[in-house]
Structures are given as structure tokens and as C-alpha cells.
Curated annotation (Swiss-Prot):
GO cellular component, as recorded: nucleus
Subunit structure: Forms homodimers. Monomers and dimers are able to bind DNA, but the off-rate is faster for monomers. Interacts with NEUROD1 and PDX1. May interact with MAFB, FOS, JUN and PCAF.
Biased composition (Gly residues): 212-226, 327-338
Protein name: Transcription factor MafA
GO biological process terms, semicolon-separated: insulin secretion; positive regulation of DNA-templated transcription; positive regulation of transcription by RNA polymerase II; regulation of transcription by RNA polymerase II; response to glucose
Compartments (UniProt record): Nucleus
PANTHER family for the chain: TRANSCRIPTION FACTOR MAF (PTHR10129), TRANSCRIPTION FACTOR MAFA (PTHR10129:SF30)
Regions of compositional bias (Low complexity) in chain numbering: 46-76, 345-361
Origin: domain of life: Eukaryota
Listed GO MF terms: DNA binding; DNA-binding transcription activator activity, RNA polymerase II-specific; DNA-binding transcription factor activity; DNA-binding transcription factor activity, RNA polymerase II-specific; RNA polymerase II cis-regulatory region sequence-specific DNA binding; sequence-specific double-stranded DNA binding
Region of interest (Leucine-zipper), residue spans: 290-311
Modified residues (Phosphothreonine): 53, 57
InterPro entries the UniProt entry points to: bZIP (IPR004827), bZIP_Maf (IPR004826), bZIP_sf (IPR046347), Maf_TF_N (IPR013592), TF_DNA-bd_sf (IPR008917), Transcription_factor_Maf_fam (IPR024874)
Highest classification ranks of the organism: Eukaryota, Metazoa, Chordata, Craniata, Vertebrata
Length: 361
């Protein structure tokens, strides 16, 4: 009784809070009838669960509120309220006979934190958050890592927590508390083992659920610059230019919008630069072709000019020969050939008169 009074002195003194905690009973609410598949999904225990009842599912999304006092008859069947109170080291129930208290005012805050943490620890269901078993393992790893950091920063709180755990496990009433304690010890060792073995395999992924958000946020913030560097160095200029838009969009899935826009602007710049270079190269090539054709045509024109000059000289030579031949066949040459011409009447009269006596002489 002295232990119970000492514990009662450290409990919250607000009557409204105590009345709310004691009167909060989920069994008085009507249960919505679900199809057989949903009911089978709700009553299926996830692998590695520490509780003997189904965890937080769409059918029971509201966690049962833990109670500092003895559990009500309605909530006694569920492991959410009674089991958590026994585990957290609250006021021992009637079956318990050992001391389950924590002395001193320094353990009050730690007791309340552990009380609510243990109450909500049973309602972390990966299936309710649409998570895979790998995400659940990552959440456990992040939770263990986070609690280890808190223990390193607050050694006094860690020592009080260990003392509180030892006393609560020693003074817990019934086999249920012992089973829960053993289960939690096994879960702690399992979490530590996974933290050491799977840390190198999952350090690139984000943690979901519970305190894993801290690790996930830090990893995401630290990897932003790495993503930017990897995205810039992932594709070369030739790959960006030659890759199709569909293939590029498929490769850019999972990156931030700013990085994708920056990479696409770089690709557009490279394509415009390549198009300008190709146009310039084509213009230079066409100019070279035209210049070569011009040189060929000019050489042909020179050859034709030389041919025209040669033909002109040959023409002049033939013309001169023709004129010479035509001059030899003139009037004097033709008369000696034996074709006499009749003299004109002016020349024929005296010649005939003079030639007649010569002819007769």
C-alpha cells in the first residue's frame, strides 16, 4: 500500500484527465461490419508482432487509451490498455505482489513518457500505413537509433529508464506481464541486431513511421546535393542529345522538379547548339562544294577560251590560204591558160589595123 500511495502522489492531479482516462472504453462503440476479406485482413497478425491481439487496422484505427488505474472490465480483454499499463509500470493490479514503483521526482517525466510510448507502441501497424515489411524493419532501425541517441544525450534519463524497466518487469503481475517483458527484451535485441546488420543495406531509403521520420529527413536533406551531382553527372552531353524524350522522362523518375527542369534546359541548350553547329557545318560544306564547282567551271571556261582561240587561228590560216589560191586564179593567169577574150571595140580597131600588115608581112 505504501508503494501504491507513493505512486499515487506522482500521478497527474487533474480529475478531468483521470476521469477521461478511466471512462474511455472502446467496447461501448458499435463495430462496423466489414466484408469477409477486410475482417480477415484486420484479424491477421503481422509477422514479428509482440501483441496477442490484432494491431491498429482500419477496423480499429483508434488506439485504446492507457489508464493509470486498474483497467475496466470492458478493456481487460484487450492487450492495449491493461498490458500497456502493466508494462509501463503503472499502479500494479491486484495479482501483482512486488513493488513496481519508481522513487523520486526525477522519474516522473520519464515515467509519463515511457507510459505513453509503451501505450502507442502496440498500435504501430505497417499495414495500416500501407507499408511493406522492409519499411517496418527500417522504422524499427530508426527507432532504435533515435532512442540510442537520446540515451547518449541524457544518461540520467537512460539510467532511470533501465531501473524502471527492471522494477516493472520484476513486480509485474501474472504471466502476461512476464511474457510482455520477455517479448520486449527480445524485440530490443532483435532491433539492435537489425540495426547492425541491415544498416548498410537500407541507409539510402527513407524511414517511415514513429521516430524514423527524423532519420529519413536527415538522410533526405543530406542526399539532396548528392542527387544534384549524380543527376548532372549521370548523363553525358551526347546521351542527352541522342536520348528520346520518353526515355529521358523514364530515367528522371524520382528526382526533384528543379533538377529535372535544369537538366531539360541543359538538354535544350545542347540541342540548339548542336542544331546551330550542324547548320553552320552544312553551310560551310555547301560553300566548299559551290567553290569547287566554280573552280571547275572556271577551268572549263579557260579551256573553252583556249579552244576558241585555236579555232580562230586555224580559221585565219584557212582564209589566208583560200585568198592566196583565189589570187592565183585571177584574169592574167586565166588568159595564159588558152581562154582568149574578145577585145573590146575600142581596142580592136587600131590593133587590127596595125596587126594586119604585120600578119601579112
Amino acid at each position: 500500500m505504501a508503494a501504491e500511495l507513493a505512486m499515487g502522489a506522482e500521478l497527474p492531479s487533474s480529475p478531468l484527465a483521470i476521469e477521461y482516462v478511466n471512462d474511455f472504453d472502446l467496447m461501448k462503440f458499435e463495430v462496423k461490419k466489414e466484408p469477409p476479406e477486410a475482417e480477415r485482413f484486420c484479424h491477421r497478425l503481422p509477422p514479428g508482432s509482440l501483441s496477442s491481439t490484432p494491431l491498429s487496422t482500419p477496423c480499429s484505427s483508434v488506439p485504446s487509451s492507457p489508464s493509470f488505474c486498474a483497467p475496466s472490465p470492458g478493456t481487460g480483454s484487450s492487450a492495449g490498455g491493461g498490458g500497456s499499463a502493466a508494462q509501463a509500470g503503472g499502479a500494479p493490479g491486484p495479482p501483482s505482489g512486488g513493488p513496481g514503483t519508481v522513487g523520486g521526482a526525477s522519474g516522473k517525466a520519464v515515467l509519463e513518457d515511457l507510459y505513453w510510448m509503451s501505450g502507442y507502441q502496440h498500435h504501430l501497424n505497417p499495414e495500416a500505413l500501407n507499408l511493406t515489411p522492409e519499411d517496418a524493419v527500417e522504422a524499427l532501425i530508426g527507432s532504435g537509433h533515435h532512442s540510442a541517441h537520446h540515451g547518449a544525450h541524457h544518461p540520467a534519463a537512460a539510467a532511470a529508464y533501465e531501473a524502471f524497466r527492471g522494477q516493472s518487469f520484476a513486480g509485474g503481475g501474472g504471466g502476461g506481464a512476464d511474457d510482455m517483458g520477455a517479448g520486449h527484451h527480445h524485440g530490443a535485441h532483435h532491433t539492435a541486431h537489425h540495426h547492425h546488420s541491415a544498416h548498410h543495406h537500407h541507409h539510402h531509403h527513407h524511414h517511415h513511421g514513429g521516430s524514423g521520420h527524423h532519420g529519413g529527413g536527415a538522410g533526405h536533406g543530406g542526399g539532396g546535393a548528392g542527387h544534384h551531382v549524380r543527376l548532372e553527372e549521370r548523363f553525358s552531353d551526347d546521351q542527352l542529345v541522342s536520348m528520346s524524350v520518353r526515355e529521358l522522362n523514364r530515367q528522371l523518375r524520382g528526382f526533384s522538379k528543379e533538377e529535372v527542369i535544369r537538366l531539360k534546359q541543359k538538354r535544350r541548350t545542347l540541342k540548339n547548339r548542336g542544331y546551330a553547329q550542324s547548320c553552320r557545318f552544312k553551310r560551310v560544306q555547301q560553300r566548299h562544294i559551290l567553290e569547287s564547282e566554280k573552280c571547275q567551271l572556271q577551268s572549263q571556261v579557260e579551256q573553252l577560251k583556249l579552244e576558241v582561240g585555236r579555232l580562230a587561228k586555224e580559221r585565219d590560216l584557212y582564209k589566208e590560204k583560200y585568198e592566196k589560191l583565189a589570187g592565183r586564179g585571177g584574169p592574167g593567169g586565166a588568159g595564159g591558160a588558152g581562154f582568149p577574150r574578145e577585145p573590146s571595140p575600142a581596142q580592136a580597131g587600131p590593133g587590127a589595123a596595125k596587126g594586119a600588115p604585120d600578119f601579112f608581112l
